Amino acid sequence: VGSVFQNPRTQFFNTDSDSEIAFGLENQGMPTEELRQRVETTAADLEIQSLRNRSLHALSGGEKQKVAFASVYAMNPDIYLLDEPSSNLDIDAIQDLRKHLKLVKQQGKTILIAEHRLYYLMDVVDRIVYMEQGQIAGIYTPEQFRAIEKDERKRMGLRAVNLHEVHPQFTSPGAAENKILKLQDVGLYYKKQAIVEHINLSAGIGEIIGVVGHNGAGKTTLSRTLCGLHKEAS
């Protein structure tokens, strides 16, 4: 059984990506040459060559999630247990995850996924188990699940099964007065390497700002900088 947790940091035993992928294989006593080949194959199958030999501390949340999945995939378990594997992933990385789940399914593996995002799984899963108040309240095929009316799905606390059904309502932005936060030409760094440069941003009292972007774009580093947890800024 291989497990991927919601927070990948809680399952890491090493400080670099290759060592983390190899860790389980080492504990199985796999010969060195076979181990190296398995790590190479894993990186190729999951298309994560760009994450090879990287410090785990330098990776974004989504990149860490990819390494966590790779460390399990390398061990070739019969059963995969995934706890919200898409929680740290951007939309492109979620599509990569979907592709990897299909690959594992084609290999004849059993997969159990606890998840809030539903849309990317609808052509992957065979059964959907709905839980309510600690009990199984329903078991559906994907076709039956898609047929649930929107209002009923909302009552069940479920998200959309098709992103084309999602139509967010936006309000016209006003000129926020009384600025409480201002960034001017700020740069963010990790071990003296630039992550983001020339950030100019201001926020007014009562204003809500969403910081979005691909995995590794610097969203978390910016947030950590604003609350004083990341010191490499200029």
Question: What are these language model-derived features?
Answer:
Residues 115-116:
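H-loop/switch region of ABC-family ATPase nucleotide-binding domains
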Residues 55-59, 63:
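Conserved ABC ATPase signature
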Residues 212-214:
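The feature captures the beta-strand-to-loop junction immediately N-terminal to the Walker
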Residues 69:
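Hydrophobic anchor residue at the start of the ABC signature
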Residues 33-51:
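Conserved ABC ATPase "signature" region
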Residues 135-157:
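Conserved beta-strand-loop-alpha-helix hinge in the C-terminal portion
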Residues 80-83:
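Catalytic Walker B motif of ABC-type/P-loop ATPase nucleotide-binding domains
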